[in-house]
Amino acid sequence: MGGSLRVAVLGAPGVGKTAIIRQFLFGDYPERHRPTDSPCLYRPAVLLDGAVYDLSIRDGDVAGPGSSPRSLEEWPDPKDWSLQDTDAFVLVYDICSPDSFDYVKALRQRIAENRPAGAPEAPILVVGNKRDRQRLRFGPRRALATLVRRGWRCGYLECSAKYNWHVLRLFRELLRCALVRTRPAHPTLRLQGALHPARCSLM
């Protein structure tokens, strides 16, 4: 058994957080958007280079029942997010929405500012979703990737949840970073996907 990892998938409403998770776990895509009204916790097992890891993937806001926050001002105190022991973060934005990118920018800053003293730094992967709408994007990929990687010191990747493009790569990169930080001598990891459908429970 390889151990366990806690992952939080965050971002503005409508950017495709749930769609990304469902493509990774179940290989399906909801054609009709349904807002995530309550946080959802998925518990899949994944195989990485022959070792099985139990994942805990949190989808949606962490403020409790109710609609997802539409701005950072609507979030509760970061110290109450129950995310301080999270091993890795996925911050999702819509490549056609500059507002969703600003949301991720502010969210990343809050996560950094409120990490408990002495706690290991949790890797953050910024993900630009809806790559299938490339012609409508608000900014060039190269410039955004450079800003995130060099300025924010976070990982950067773009995907299309609709067409399942780079979704597996997204989680492979995230888990690789999380495990390398906890196990510096760990060899290159190869994510082979979820072993079985995840259990989902509303919190």
Curated annotation (Swiss-Prot):
Q: Which GO terms describe its molecular function?
A: G protein activity; GTP binding
Which residues participate in GTP binding?
11-18, 59-62, 129-132
Q: Which residues carry this modification: Cysteine methyl ester?
A: C200
Residues with lipidation of kind S-farnesyl cysteine: C200
Q: Which InterPro entries match?
A: P-loop_NTPase (IPR027417), Ras-like_GTPase_Reg (IPR052661), Small_GTPase (IPR001806)
Residues covered by region (Small GTPase-like): 1-203
According to its UniProt record, the EC number is 3.6.5.2
Q: Give a single Pfam family match.
A: Ras
Q: Which SUPFAM superfamilies match?
A: P-loop containing nucleoside triphosphate hydrolases (SSF52540)
Membrane topology field: Lipid-anchor
Signal peptide, first to last residue: none
What this protein is called in its record is Ras-like protein family member 10A
Gene source species: Mus musculus
